[in-house]
A protein has these predicted regions:
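Hydrophobic alpha-helical transmembrane segments of membrane proteins
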Residues: 1-100, 110-277
Length: 277
């Protein structure tokens, strides 16, 4: 039954998600093209520096390409955010609105229903995350004229606290991407839990309550991890490196716990507490 529910969820998600993914890819490719064009115009401006008019025009064109590249980068980021909003609102609509009455009459356990929605949502979020990582890598290659080491550095920054102890190599890049995928699971799980708690507690403005819960819970978790991370940086170099590694593992465990616990608690609340009447 889990497989059937998962397939049904994917059929409902894939068309809107494909449009958002296409926007992300097109924006990323155009942005990379603008970066390459900026470099070409800058070189041309160097040759034309003896001619005031040509140099001024080249300078203006460089600004245009830079702004276009920044706008394309914003579109990539906005597409990534949009897919999470789409996932969350579909979960809310199919569980806690009038459509939820029909959903909850299905002859399946609430845990199976929520799990199917989570895995479909996580698959989409993971796909968008990987595409965003690939576009960021290509953009960095364009900016640095093919310097692969800088790509490794950028990807390793996705590793959270582990980025402070990594050497920017392949292993750090893999850890960074893996942490980004774990963060995607955390985001989906926490969103589902926040929406469920909002539907349970709030009589009105349930979505607003869910947003407040999501921000509040996420802020508390980030604050606690930040405090632990700062405390871990007290000591000699060897101790700090080890402790930051511990904090990195702790961060991953917490994110996975929030993802799994959010799904489990959401399923329990849907079954036992949420009243759609």
């Amino acid at each position: 039954m889990l497989g059937k529910l998962f397939a049904q969820e994917m059929r409902a998600l894939w068309k809107p998600a494909a449009i958002m993914l296409a926007v992300m890819v097109v924006a990323g490719v155009v942005g990379i093209g603008c970066i390459e064009a900026t470099d070409a115009v800058s070189r041309a401006a160097g040759f034309a520096s003896r001619y005031v008019n040509e140099a001024s025009a080249a300078s203006n064109l460089t600004v245009v390409f830079v702004m276009a590249a920044l706008f394309c980068g914003f579109l990539v980021w906005a597409s990534l955010v949009a897919v999470y909003v789409f996932i969350a609102m579909r979960f809310y609509r199919t569980m806690f609105t009038d459509e939820g009455y029909l959903t909850l009459t299905l002859p399946v356990r609430a845990g199976t229903l929520v799990a199917a929605k989570f895995w479909a949502a996580f698959l989409l979020a993971a796909a968008f995350t990987l595409v965003a990582c690939a576009l960021a890598s290509l953009a960095m290659l364009a900016i640095t004229d093919g310097d692969g080491d800088m790509v490794s550095v950028v990807l390793s920054l996705l590793g959270g606290w582990s980025a402070l102890t990594g050497n920017g190599g392949v292993a750090s890049s893999i850890m960074g991407v893996a942490n980004a995928l774990v963060s995607a699971a955390y985001t989906v799980g926490l969103a589902f839990l926040s929406l469920t708690l909002g539907a349970w507690w709030a009589r009105r403005h349930k979505v607003a309550a869910a947003v407040a819960l999501y921000v509040g819970i996420g802020w508390v978790i980030s604050l606690l991890l930040s405090i632990v991370g700062v405390l871990a940086m007290v000591g000699d170099t060897g101790t700090v490196s080890f402790m930051l590694g511990v904090v990195s593992v702790m961060q991953t465990v917490v994110n996975l716990a929030v993802a799994g616990g959010g799904v489990a608690l959401s399923a329990y609340l849907v079954r036992a507490k949420v009243d759609l009447s």
